[in-house]
């Protein structure tokens, strides 16, 4: 079965679109956080326990895992991915299929197109889910990608002189 290649923008905010560029709304901030976290490391399998702790640090393990299952269901419905081809489940955990998404933050880091065109602002700018461990990760990624953007813009400025 084939599936639509999704477009995910994480630089400057969170925007998700289908292959035709039509916006896809997620009914839950946690679903967006789950997708952003997995998509920022395409193909990497992340354990359910790690994700549950990241997104629901104030809940017990059983309740956090139940919340993860529910959030994954919400995400898959929005993506029309009940077969699990875009967000892949395995015994080891969850992953985003790298061929299912075009992800601006990943392309920015790979230098797939002019980085200055891709960088639209801080990583997940304005995004907040009130989960301290996720927020710590988010701050780190914002700082790292912001520094990378500054290097890119500095190099462009030096080239133009």
Where are these regions (language model features)?
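Short capping segments at the starts of secondary-structure elements
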Residues: 37-51
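Generic start-of-chain signal for non-secretory N-termini
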Residues: 1-7
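A structural micro-motif at secondary-structure boundaries
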Residues: 10-32
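C-terminal flanking helix
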Residues: 72, 76-83
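Residue-level signal for inorganic ion chemistry
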Residues: 51, 75, 108
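Intrinsically disordered, charged and Pro/Gly-enriched terminal/linker segments
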Residues: 2, 24-25, 29-30, 40-43, ...
